[in-house]
Swiss-Prot record:
It comes from the Eukaryota. Residues 1-20 form the signal peptide. PANTHER family: M CELL-TYPE AGGLUTINATION PROTEIN MAM3-RELATED. The lineage of its organism: Eukaryota, Fungi, Dikarya, Ascomycota, Taphrinomycotina. One of its GO terms (biological process) is flocculation. It holds the Pfam family GLEYA. GO terms for cellular component: external side of cell wall; extracellular region. It comes from Schizosaccharomyces pombe (strain 972 / ATCC 24843) (Fission yeast). This is Putative cell agglutination protein pfl8.
Amino acid sequence: MNSYISLIFTLLFFTSAARSSSVSVETGSCVRYTTIYSSGSSEFTSTITPETPSSSSSTFVPISTHTSSATNTTSGQLSISSSSSTSSEYSSSSIPITTVSSSDSFIPSSSQTISASSSTTDNVIVSSSISSTVSSTPVSTIYSGTSGTTFVSSSTTYQVIPTQICDGVRGLEYAVYNYDLPSESTFCHPSNGYTEVSTFNKPAYFGSKDLKQSAPLFTGIFSSLDDIPTYSASDYLPAYPPNPEGMSSTSSSCKTIVYQFFFRVPATDNWSLFVKNVDDAFFGWFGDKAISGWSNVNYDAYAHWRIGAYGMGTFDLGYLEQDSFVPVRFVLANGAYIGGFDFAFNSSSTGPVRTTSYSYTSTCDKSFLPFGKGNGGLDEGTANV
């Protein structure tokens, strides 16, 4: 698009150029995790949701001296540590929680037993990643913490037992390609100075077997701790990880960005996707077809730039259950001059949510295909835009 003319018109008005729709979404789900901390006849139970850190631990202050042991029966990471403390003694009615000052983490071999012992004023901390199964076993190996613990046999054993070992992998993936469709001359190099948006009508090409590029220009994954940078009216690509300097110094003209991720629903409610700053054209797919079978004609969302207005739109995802997964795919293409695209998921109970906090590259039983040729796209027909 012509950046100067667009700026003038955008200051005058900001209107929508979008296809709003109600989308039928196929979803999947993963289990929550219940971890039990026990000592003798008492136990404390907590629930770990996927949005909490992927490991859990609890601190126990023993009466007199004792030995704690645990066995890791899967490939998960096991941690046992000891820290000096003046906390009150452990009683059957409560489990004091204190700060861990030192710890040691390792991956034991199959059926290896690790034990930890402490004096009266020390804490013994037993923790495990949620992909582990940890249970009490006879003591076989002495672990000494940094506080100078001593080994004394005892009948008291503390267990950390994460139930279930199924969860997805956090992250939001993207790939950047050169726009090399036959419509390049009109989409990227318009004779009248304005991108002819309607000539981009084959978005699935960028994930099909027909893709001519052997590899994307850039590719990366947003972690759950990353924010997606604002991308609006820019002459350059957005500063995405892991190479923000390289992307932000590369022209956004004649480029296509493909996004793929599973959106884990934060709360049971009616959900929608809101897009804005679209420059020049955006296509979206939801449900299993976003993984494989996304085509030029079965898209669920579309928005585009036009003279005087960036594309924007709201797309209804329907009523979704908490912790269900929605496969999502976006294709954004920019022709001439500046580009842009921002998006957010929204519900009445949560408002707009931070997308990366609820994004996964795979779930318990589903994953996306690698970027490049055969990324699940079917370059058949043309979009009616």
